[in-house]
């Protein structure tokens, strides 16, 4: 088995938002991972599984120095400032492969996981199971298909989220062009209910199981 990780380079700091992923507002990183996994057989022999997907903030960090700093201290500070945030496979054996320097009772300097003294992993929202990875990828694909079908059917209406007032077409300089007016019946905000990691993963699992059940029932009828 092979394990694959991807980096999504960003010009600002990012962390994975499960609610945004569910509503199709954060599709880029999961799409990169999906495409990499789909094409992994062209580069690697055998089965390839996801080990992680991370945001990397591209920047020239400013290091605040209160006292004399050795080269080693400086390098550690830089590494900490570039710590990768995103999604990690909740598997100790796999994490040992991607950061073998982490021992029991230590936190990784590169990733956002910590090994407890008992050898298990500390609780962390970045840690998810293999099924969770597959479910997030499936939901991301479903969001893309839904968006594509709407475009092809001519459904091009503005569909902003009220909790995102920075959306340029709603409150920014392009509002005069978009002509978005919530008092009109054709202009409505999309509902955005903030969901926890657990809620998102549970809802996606239920949706997938429901879809599979419907597909099986249709197959039996035919």
What are these regions (language model features)?
Residues 1-222:
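Structural signature of nuclease core domains in nucleic-acid processing machines
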